[in-house]
């Protein structure tokens, strides 16, 4: 459903955000 899609998107964004914090460009 749409809820799981939103959760998946948020999870991806969170992972990307963590990588950005750990390894700033």
Curated annotation (Swiss-Prot):
Q: Which UniProt keywords apply?
A: Amphibian defense peptide, Antimicrobial, Secreted
Lyase among the record's keywords?
no
GO cellular component terms, alphabetically, are: extracellular region
Q: Give yes or no: UniProt keyword Secreted.
A: yes
What tissues has this protein been observed in?
Expressed by the skin glands.
Q: Which domain of life is it from?
A: Eukaryota
Which terms does the UniProt entry file under GO BP? defense response
Assign the protein's first listed, main location to one coarse class: secreted
Where is the protein localized?
A: Secreted
What's this protein's function?
Antimicrobial peptide.
**Family statement drawn from the similarity comment of this UniProt entry:** Belongs to the gastrin/cholecystokinin family. Magainin subfamily.
- Name of this protein: Xenoposin precursor fragment BM2
Annotated organism of origin: Xenopus boumbaensis (Mawa clawed frog)
């Amino acid at each position: 459903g749409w809820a799981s899609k939103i959760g998946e998107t948020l999870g991806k964004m969170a992972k990307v955000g963590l990588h950005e914090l750990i390894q700033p460009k």
